[in-house]
């Protein structure tokens, strides 16, 4: 849903994908500047497989969150984000990270600030749980993921080696299917990291 709307500025019906897609996005105000957007599949069983394929070349990551369903999906969202954040390649390259809180046109959508706070809390819980669990079944204890954040402190995004920002947006815009998408904050961020 996100990539077609960003490219066209208009709402378009989509379905959860099972393959990646890419397109060149021309920055507004500077048509000579462009970035290649790679949209990873939304299907949860394929996400990490495709992340593995593209993470080494990523200069930036846009992590899209459904602001309406966030409350009931917070554990799953945090789990996937945790896997991204502790990945050794992502940590080494430290690409800029934007958490795009989508569906802000819906009245019950959670704010970017609330989503950030709840993700920090849930990621902290995951970090504590993971650090207490054995790292392997064979007892070798090696090869586990990197520590998320600073030891002895509750997790917050400022502890990461990459800059993390949160923005509110809407692929549908304020007029629903007939209106323009509201990606101003996302477009500003893309121009900044391009």
Language-model segments: residues:
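Switch II (G3) loop of P-loop NTPases
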Residues: 29-50
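Inter-motif core of Ras-like GTPase G domains
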Residues: 47-74, 78-91, 97-101
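Conserved GTP-binding G-domain of TRAFAC-class P-loop NTPases and closely related GTPase folds
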Residues: 84-194
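Short coil/turn segments at secondary-structure boundaries
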Residues: 3-7, 18, 40, 49-53, ...
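Switch I (effector-binding) loop of TRAFAC-class P-loop GTPase G-domains
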Residues: 6-32, 147-153
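Core residues of folded domains in eukaryotic genome-function proteins
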Residues: 21-23, 31-36, 57-61, 93-97, ...
